[in-house]
Amino acid sequence: MASIVIAQGGGPTAVINQTLCGAISAARRLDPGLRILGARHGVRGLTARNVVDLTGLSETDLQRLGNTPNSGLGSTRDKPDPKACDAIFSALEAFDARAFIYIGGNDTAGTLELLRSQSSGQCRFVHAPKTIDNDLVANDHVPGFISAGLFVANAFTSMDLDFRAMPGIYVAIVMGRHAGFLTASPAAWQSGPEDAPHLIYSPEKPFSVAQFLDDVGAVYARLGRCVVSMSEGVQDETGRPLAEALAAGAVERDAHGNVQLTGGDLGMEIQKALKSRFPKARARVDTLGYLPRGYLGLIDPTDQAEAFAAGAFAAERAFSQSGSVVLDFDGQRTNPKLVPLDQVAGRTRHMPDSFFDGTNTISDEGRRYFKRLLPPRPDIFTPFV
């Protein structure tokens, strides 16, 4: 029996299962006799033919799966070598697969482009977008980003209220290896210079600890508090991530060559620098880590709907051609479309210079972008202090 194979790659998100459900629903509608298989743990599971039959999943369970964050099929960051590619092709042939849909980020797209370029069979290879980093080229924004940005915006608004009540300095380190979209997302809720985050440090702009301390000191002197959003991927003037420099050679990389940043020494070093420069100030550094990417309590409905639509569109196109699904914004609404895989594979989208006002604040244009994506800020009372 002919089949379509679906897998999930890279880091989980709050809505990646919606993309899976969209693909399942569309495949059922387009070919009721098609077998729908889910590969456990991405291409790793596919090489071992470790799959689950999703064909008979009930509508109730499909809805529950879509509303559940993180990767229902499991995930991997494996990059298949030639032996693994042969095993994948063999598995796809054994399953009589008409298409392989892989949901993930730019490394996942790169894996699919590798498979597509080496395939000699009838199988189509379609990438469905996912990443909280929002760094896939050719996309206006990416499923998973809005929900993660909503978490980060809530976190900074909450900590701003905390540090109004008990003044001091607060830094939160936010995920984002090469792009600062998630780090800058709280700018959506800024209405004036007193609203946090007061300083935003992104990988797109060179970072200096000395300049950072001067910046903090200026805000602290003006407001009596300073709340900072800092990307885990901040880089020095040479382009080297500060977290990598602090690791002193003990760098952990995944199969795609990405440095492991989350959970490193960056927060500890920033804390030390703050305490040294401002010994009498209340200073706190937190690493948000994995919390924003799949937080059950803050899943945005628009993010869910767009993720589902991306999965459905991937399945619709998978019957005729390979490619990468991207989200396009026409000025009024977001629509999925298909572009060649090599336009997305292994590439990184950065925040444009026009999104910045200097090196540590977001411009009006940048704020308009984030405001368009995130829901409005809750109506909170401005404290008396």
Q: Where on the chain are the PLM-derived regions?
A:
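C-terminal non-catalytic interaction/assembly regions of soluble proteins
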Residues: E244-V385
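Glycine-rich oxoanion-binding loops at beta->alpha junctions
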Residues: T47-R98, D107-T108, I132, P143-I146, ...
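Short, ordered loop/turn segments at secondary-structure junctions
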Residues: G9-G11, A39-R44, R77-D78, G105-T108, ...
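Short glycine/serine/threonine-rich phosphate/pyrophosphate-binding segments
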Residues: T13-A23, L46-T47, D81-D86, G105-E113, ...
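Accessory alpha-helical/coil subdomains and C-terminal extensions
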Residues: L34, A99-G104, G110-L114, Q118-Q122, ...
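N-terminal phosphate-binding or glycine-rich loops at protein starts, especially the Walker A/P-loop
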Residues: M1-N50
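Short glycine-rich or small-residue beta-strand-to-loop segments that form or flank ligand, phosphate
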Residues: S3-T13, S71-T76, R98-I103, I169-V174, ...
